[in-house]
Amino acid sequence: GALKGIVGGNRGKEGNRIWNRASDTTRQIGSTIKPITSYVLGIEKDLITYSTVIEDRQVVINPDEVSYSQPLWVPKNEYNSFKGFVTVRTAVIRSINTVAVQVTQMLGTTTSYDFLKYSLNVDTLTAADDSYSPMALGSLSKGMTLVKLAGAYQMFGNGGVRTEPYSYTRVEDTYGNVILEKNTVPVRVISA
Protein backbone atom coordinates (compact mmCIF):
# COMPACT_ATOMS: atom_id res chain seq x y z
CA GLY A 1 0.00 0.00 0.00
CA ALA A 2 2.98 2.36 0.25
CA LEU A 3 3.00 4.94 -2.51
CA LYS A 4 6.57 5.03 -3.85
CA GLY A 5 5.93 8.09 -5.98
CA ILE A 6 3.05 10.16 -7.25
CA VAL A 7 2.70 12.76 -9.97
CA GLY A 8 -0.30 15.00 -9.50
CA GLY A 9 0.31 17.39 -12.37
CA ASN A 10 2.70 18.25 -15.17
CA ARG A 11 4.08 21.56 -13.87
CA GLY A 12 6.25 22.41 -10.90
CA LYS A 13 4.79 22.71 -7.44
CA GLU A 14 2.75 25.89 -7.21
CA GLY A 15 1.75 25.78 -3.55
CA ASN A 16 0.75 23.64 -0.59
CA ARG A 17 -2.50 21.68 -0.40
CA ILE A 18 -3.24 22.13 -4.09
CA TRP A 19 -5.24 19.79 -6.33
CA ASN A 20 -3.53 16.48 -7.02
CA ARG A 21 -4.85 14.79 -10.15
CA ALA A 22 -3.71 11.33 -9.03
CA SER A 23 -5.48 11.37 -5.67
CA ASP A 24 -8.22 14.00 -6.06
CA THR A 25 -9.53 13.63 -9.63
CA THR A 26 -11.93 10.83 -10.49
CA ARG A 27 -12.00 9.49 -14.03
CA GLN A 28 -13.83 6.79 -15.92
CA ILE A 29 -11.66 3.68 -15.69
CA GLY A 30 -13.17 1.73 -18.58
CA SER A 31 -11.71 -1.70 -19.29
CA THR A 32 -9.22 -1.51 -16.42
CA ILE A 33 -12.14 -2.66 -14.25
CA LYS A 34 -12.45 -6.06 -15.96
CA PRO A 35 -9.66 -7.86 -14.07
CA ILE A 36 -10.79 -6.55 -10.66
CA THR A 37 -14.57 -7.03 -10.94
CA SER A 38 -15.13 -9.79 -13.48
CA TYR A 39 -12.17 -12.06 -14.05
CA VAL A 40 -10.59 -12.30 -10.59
CA LEU A 41 -13.97 -12.95 -8.97
CA GLY A 42 -14.92 -15.51 -11.63
CA ILE A 43 -11.69 -17.37 -10.87
CA GLU A 44 -12.13 -16.98 -7.09
CA LYS A 45 -15.63 -18.44 -7.24
CA ASP A 46 -14.53 -21.32 -9.51
CA LEU A 47 -16.79 -20.16 -12.34
CA ILE A 48 -13.91 -19.75 -14.80
CA THR A 49 -10.21 -20.43 -15.27
CA TYR A 50 -7.78 -18.83 -17.70
CA SER A 51 -8.46 -21.70 -20.11
CA THR A 52 -12.27 -21.58 -19.87
CA VAL A 53 -13.78 -21.09 -23.32
CA ILE A 54 -16.55 -18.49 -23.65
CA GLU A 55 -18.21 -17.38 -26.86
CA ASP A 56 -17.52 -13.81 -27.93
CA ARG A 57 -21.04 -13.12 -29.18
CA GLN A 58 -23.79 -10.57 -29.01
CA VAL A 59 -25.10 -10.17 -25.46
CA VAL A 60 -28.40 -8.46 -24.70
CA ILE A 61 -28.97 -7.15 -21.18
CA ASN A 62 -32.24 -5.84 -19.85
CA PRO A 63 -31.18 -3.61 -16.93
CA ASP A 64 -34.69 -3.67 -15.50
CA GLU A 65 -35.86 -7.26 -15.79
CA VAL A 66 -38.92 -6.67 -13.62
CA SER A 67 -40.75 -3.72 -15.19
CA TYR A 68 -38.88 -3.52 -18.52
CA SER A 69 -39.00 0.28 -18.25
CA GLN A 70 -35.42 0.75 -19.48
CA PRO A 71 -34.12 0.00 -22.96
CA LEU A 72 -32.09 -3.11 -23.67
CA TRP A 73 -28.31 -2.75 -23.45
CA VAL A 74 -26.21 -4.46 -26.11
CA PRO A 75 -22.49 -4.08 -25.32
CA LYS A 76 -20.15 -3.88 -28.28
CA ASN A 77 -16.51 -4.78 -28.73
CA GLU A 78 -13.92 -2.23 -29.82
CA TYR A 79 -13.59 -4.03 -33.16
CA ASN A 80 -17.39 -4.07 -33.80
CA SER A 81 -17.56 -7.80 -34.43
CA PHE A 82 -17.22 -11.09 -32.60
CA LYS A 83 -14.37 -13.59 -32.51
CA GLY A 84 -16.40 -16.70 -31.68
CA PHE A 85 -15.12 -19.06 -28.99
CA VAL A 86 -12.13 -17.68 -27.05
CA THR A 87 -10.35 -18.56 -23.83
CA VAL A 88 -10.64 -16.25 -20.85
CA ARG A 89 -6.91 -15.59 -21.27
CA THR A 90 -7.54 -14.32 -24.82
CA ALA A 91 -10.50 -12.25 -23.60
CA VAL A 92 -8.27 -10.57 -21.00
CA ILE A 93 -5.45 -9.94 -23.49
CA ARG A 94 -7.80 -8.51 -26.13
CA SER A 95 -10.08 -6.79 -23.62
CA ILE A 96 -13.19 -8.39 -25.11
CA ASN A 97 -16.23 -6.61 -23.70
CA THR A 98 -18.84 -9.28 -24.38
CA VAL A 99 -16.89 -11.95 -22.49
CA ALA A 100 -16.40 -9.66 -19.46
CA VAL A 101 -20.16 -8.99 -19.46
CA GLN A 102 -20.92 -12.72 -19.58
CA VAL A 103 -18.59 -13.41 -16.64
CA THR A 104 -20.29 -10.59 -14.73
CA GLN A 105 -23.64 -12.21 -15.55
CA MET A 106 -22.36 -15.47 -14.00
CA LEU A 107 -21.31 -13.59 -10.86
CA GLY A 108 -24.19 -11.15 -10.57
CA THR A 109 -23.47 -7.44 -10.49
CA THR A 110 -23.91 -7.19 -6.72
CA THR A 111 -20.99 -9.58 -6.16
CA SER A 112 -18.70 -7.31 -8.18
CA TYR A 113 -20.13 -4.14 -6.62
CA ASP A 114 -19.70 -5.42 -3.06
CA PHE A 115 -16.13 -6.56 -3.79
CA LEU A 116 -15.21 -3.10 -5.11
CA LYS A 117 -16.94 -1.26 -2.30
CA TYR A 118 -16.12 -3.38 0.73
CA SER A 119 -12.99 -5.40 -0.11
CA LEU A 120 -11.19 -2.83 -2.28
CA ASN A 121 -12.62 0.20 -0.42
CA VAL A 122 -13.72 2.13 -3.52
CA ASP A 123 -15.65 5.02 -1.99
CA THR A 124 -16.95 6.69 -5.16
CA LEU A 125 -19.54 4.04 -6.03
CA THR A 126 -23.23 4.90 -6.18
CA ALA A 127 -26.26 2.60 -6.10
CA ALA A 128 -26.57 3.05 -9.89
CA ASP A 129 -23.16 1.39 -10.30
CA ASP A 130 -24.62 -1.98 -9.26
CA SER A 131 -25.35 -2.72 -12.91
CA TYR A 132 -23.70 -4.47 -15.87
CA SER A 133 -22.10 -1.55 -17.71
CA PRO A 134 -20.34 -0.13 -14.63
CA MET A 135 -19.29 -3.49 -13.15
CA ALA A 136 -18.24 -5.23 -16.39
CA LEU A 137 -16.96 -2.31 -18.50
CA GLY A 138 -16.06 0.42 -16.01
CA SER A 139 -18.63 3.11 -16.77
CA LEU A 140 -18.89 4.13 -13.12
CA SER A 141 -21.13 7.07 -12.22
CA LYS A 142 -18.33 9.00 -10.50
CA GLY A 143 -15.27 7.11 -11.73
CA MET A 144 -12.23 6.37 -9.54
CA THR A 145 -9.02 8.13 -8.63
CA LEU A 146 -5.75 6.76 -9.97
CA VAL A 147 -4.60 6.07 -6.40
CA LYS A 148 -7.72 3.96 -5.70
CA LEU A 149 -7.29 2.09 -9.00
CA ALA A 150 -3.63 1.32 -8.26
CA GLY A 151 -4.65 0.28 -4.75
CA ALA A 152 -7.19 -2.14 -6.22
CA TYR A 153 -4.61 -3.70 -8.53
CA GLN A 154 -2.03 -4.26 -5.78
CA MET A 155 -3.72 -7.55 -4.80
CA PHE A 156 -2.26 -9.12 -7.95
CA GLY A 157 1.33 -8.36 -6.96
CA ASN A 158 0.91 -8.95 -3.21
CA GLY A 159 -0.30 -12.55 -3.17
CA GLY A 160 -3.96 -11.59 -2.82
CA VAL A 161 -3.35 -9.12 0.01
CA ARG A 162 -4.33 -5.45 -0.13
CA THR A 163 -3.35 -2.50 2.05
CA GLU A 164 -5.04 0.88 1.80
CA PRO A 165 -2.67 3.17 -0.16
CA TYR A 166 -0.67 5.53 2.05
CA SER A 167 2.01 8.15 1.46
CA TYR A 168 3.70 8.39 4.88
CA THR A 169 4.71 6.08 7.70
CA ARG A 170 5.36 8.60 10.46
CA VAL A 171 5.80 12.31 11.09
CA GLU A 172 8.15 13.56 13.81
CA ASP A 173 8.84 17.03 15.17
CA THR A 174 12.37 18.44 15.39
CA TYR A 175 12.87 16.68 18.74
CA GLY A 176 11.99 13.25 17.41
CA ASN A 177 8.55 13.10 19.00
CA VAL A 178 6.08 11.17 16.88
CA ILE A 179 3.25 13.46 15.85
CA LEU A 180 1.56 11.14 13.39
CA GLU A 181 2.09 7.48 12.60
CA LYS A 182 0.43 5.37 9.92
CA ASN A 183 -0.76 1.98 11.08
CA THR A 184 -1.40 -0.20 8.06
CA VAL A 185 -3.53 -3.31 8.15
CA PRO A 186 -3.02 -5.72 5.24
CA VAL A 187 -6.21 -7.60 4.31
CA ARG A 188 -6.50 -10.74 2.22
CA VAL A 189 -9.03 -10.00 -0.53
CA ILE A 190 -8.37 -12.95 -2.86
CA SER A 191 -6.60 -16.27 -2.48
CA ALA A 192 -2.96 -16.33 -3.52
Residue ranges and their predicted role:
Residues I48-S112, T174-A192:
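Conserved catalytic neighborhood of penicillin-recognizing serine enzymes
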Residues A2-L3, N10-E14, Q28, V59-N62, ...:
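Solvent-exposed loop/turn segments at secondary-structure junctions
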Residues G1, Q28-D56, A91, A152-F156:
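Active-site SXXK
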Residues T37, T49, T87, T98-Q102, ...:
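Extracytoplasmic/secreted proteins, especially bacterial periplasmic and envelope-associated proteins
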Residues I43-T49, I61, V99, L107, ...:
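A generic secondary-structure signal for well-formed alpha-helical elements
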